[in-house]
Amino acid sequence: MVGAVTQIADRPTDPSPWSPRETELLAVTLRLLQEHGYDRLTVDAVAASARASKATVYRRWPSKAELVLAAFIEGIRQVAVPPNTGNLRDDLLRLGELICREVGQHASTIRAVLVEVSRNPALNDVLQHQFVDHRKALIQYILQQAVDRGEISSAAISDELWDLLPGYLIFRSIIPNRPPTQDTVQALVDDVILPSLTRSTG
């Protein structure tokens, strides 16, 4: 467990897998998503706005769902810098606030993409390896920093903790009329996560 945490903690973020031109296309896609929503987004509009051919877009992303998922993941990757406040509680609060802000901006897109993911195993693999694993690496980095500072023991870290903070906040963000608030983040950190990490392991 400790070895795995340390290995990823040394490299909390990965470089973009996309070329500069592909990154530009994904940025255009994300902008149009925010302006028009998933249902009204078309590959034609993305190609026109990015001054690219539809063939160029489809060659890299064969479906709208794949394009949108890639755009969302890349957008999150660019802003998901692990906080380093000097203490675990503040790091977790900062990360929770980041998740709420970014997921809240794209809640409708996430709902639409999750429907497509449920129908397409290939999309599910992308979601797992490029989104879920990256969120896990951020949490691992934060927890390993806390271990190094002596705030918690590595023995207190369990696999379930990787999903708890991002998983619950994303769930609340995509449920209509129940967005998480700063109080939600604080309660999750103070009442659930920190007690789990600081409990005696015998």
Swiss-Prot record:
Repeat keyword on record: yes
Keyword set, alphabetical order: DNA-binding, Repeat, Transcription, Transcription regulation
Residues in coiled coil: none
Region listing for Disordered, in residue ranges: 1-20
Keyword Repeat belongs to the record: yes
GO annotation terms (biological process): regulation of DNA-templated transcription
Name this protein carries in UniProt: Uncharacterized HTH-type transcriptional regulator Rv1556
Organism whose genome encodes this protein: Mycobacterium tuberculosis (strain ATCC 25618 / H37Rv)
Highest classification ranks of the organism: Bacteria, Bacillati, Actinomycetota, Actinomycetes, Mycobacteriales
